[in-house]
Amino acid sequence: GDGGYLMLHSEMITSLQEKKKITILLFNNHGFQCIHNLQREHGSDGFGNEFRYRDETTGRLTGEYLPLDFAAHAASLGAKSYKAHTAEQLKDALLKAKNETTTVLIEISVLPGSGTDGYESWWNVGVPEVSVSEKVTAASERRKQRLAEIHII
């Protein structure tokens, strides 16, 4: 996604440097949404995982999303880039990418919070057992119950 790209876009530079074409599908959901969801699942309201402006009234990072243009960034590094806001645009971008001879980035717009469920998977992350937040202590109790259900063979 866009969060991972911000940490690892240097891999694209390596592909350009070595003239080894790769096609990058960048799902832009305005932040580290899987971590944001994990925070909320554990009783937090979330902090710092969405690319938002600070709200001038509250002082919190709950303002408008930053207008980051990852396709323009990739192009500035020398890659070919496309944006896809619809399924048809994505199909068109994929066909164009297939015919390119250099690295391609396709920025795909995704609505925040529209990810899939965990499909019975579980990310065992520590949760404080003591907190002034009832949501956090409830999340801690859910974690304890889940751990009690695990049977290791």
Segments predicted by a language model, with ranges:
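Thiamine diphosphate
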Residues: 1-153
